[in-house]
């Protein structure tokens, strides 16, 4: 089989059908990943055809690197060639990722500066029965800030219908949206979504770090544990009872175990609908 076709088969085995032909020039090229947002190009690949054909590919969105070679190296020289190419691809990927994140951070800071204080009657806030807590608003979208090392690095747009979108290329892993003030020896709740965090802050008065996703609970927890070693971390997990494997509970349980901290989950009365999954859902149900 032609090496380019074989490389493309390897890409499609991981990411599904793609509509591009890899260029074998040793530099990063981007492509659309099947089932990602239309028009996005989160996939990336690097291909070499000289010597032993080899390459790498992955997704900006999902992370990770997949390595491919047309055959096993025949000698130490070929093995070293493949190793150097993989290292070069890694460096290219990291440089491009850093560039994309910096561009997104600059855009986030510009949008945040130009936005106005959020309307307390915004449809999303009304639906969640939450106060704005310093959110800003641009046109019809709420802006939720994400911070890392005290710097604004990304924004989550929340539209009136509840649709959510981060800035393209913006950093999320290890970043969070804060509510309240972190104090030595006091609790910090780490949760998924902003509305859940706002609910926890309003109910407890404690500081909250909204990690934005289940898989980001642990990275945020590690960051907070390093920077606030005297704080009392509490993972406040979602309970995705209707989803296979209950990803919210599973991720929260693993994060709490890895951090050695307390885990809290919504305590459901017997008559609560199964589709409710987080602390905000529980509060809204109780208010009915």
Task: Describe the role of every protein-language-model region.
Residues 16-20, 130, 261:
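Short aromatic/hydrophobic-glycine micro-motifs
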Residues 1-123, 240, 247-250:
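Non-catalytic accessory segments of DNA primases and related replication-initiation nucleases
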Residues 123, 132-137, 153, 234:
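Phosphate-handling catalytic cores of nucleic-acid transaction enzymes
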Residues 117, 121-130, 139, 149:
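Serine endopeptidase catalytic core focused on the charge-relay Asp
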Residues 103, 140-229:
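Phosphate-handling DNA/RNA-contact segment within nucleic-acid enzymes
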Residues 27-30, 140-143, 268-277:
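A short acidic, often aromatic-flanked loop/helix-cap motif at beta-alpha or helix-coil junctions
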Residues 1-6, 186, 202-288:
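TOPRIM fold recognition
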């Amino acid at each position: 089989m032609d090496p380019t076709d074989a490389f493309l088969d390897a890409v499609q085995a991981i990411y599904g059908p793609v509509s591009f032909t890899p260029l074998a020039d040793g530099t990063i090229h981007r492509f659309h990943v099947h089932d990602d947002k239309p028009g996005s190009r989160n996939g990336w690949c690097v291909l070499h055809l000289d010597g032993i054909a080899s390459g790498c590919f992955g997704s900006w969105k999902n992370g990770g690197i997949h390595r491919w070679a047309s055959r096993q190296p025949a000698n130490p020289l070929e093995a070293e060639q493949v190793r150097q190419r993989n290292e070069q691809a890694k460096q290219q990927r990291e440089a491009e990722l850093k560039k994309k994140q910096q561009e997104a951070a600059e855009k986030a800071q510009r949008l945040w500066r130009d936005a106005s204080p959020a309307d307390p009657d915004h449809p999303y806030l009304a639906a969640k029965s939450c106060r704005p807590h310093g959110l800003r608003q641009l046109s019809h979208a709420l802006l939720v800030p994400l911070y890392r090392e005290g710097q604004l690095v990304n924004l989550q747009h929340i539209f009136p219908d509840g649709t959510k979108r981060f800035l393209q290329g913006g950093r999320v892993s290890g970043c969070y949206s804060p509510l309240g003030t972190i104090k030595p020896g006091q609790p910090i709740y780490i949760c998924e979504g902003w509305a859940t965090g706002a609910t926890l802050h309003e109910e407890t008065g404690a500081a909250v770090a909204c990690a934005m996703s289940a898989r980001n609970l642990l990275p945020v927890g590690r960051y907070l544990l390093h920077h606030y070693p005297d704080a009392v971390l509490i993972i406040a997990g979602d309970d995705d009872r209707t989803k296979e494997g209950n990803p919210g509970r599973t991720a929260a349980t693993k994060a709490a175990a890895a951090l050695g901290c307390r885990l809290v989950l919504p305590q459901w009365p017997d008559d609560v609908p199964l589709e409710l999954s987080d602390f905000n859902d529980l509060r809204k149900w109780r208010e009915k």
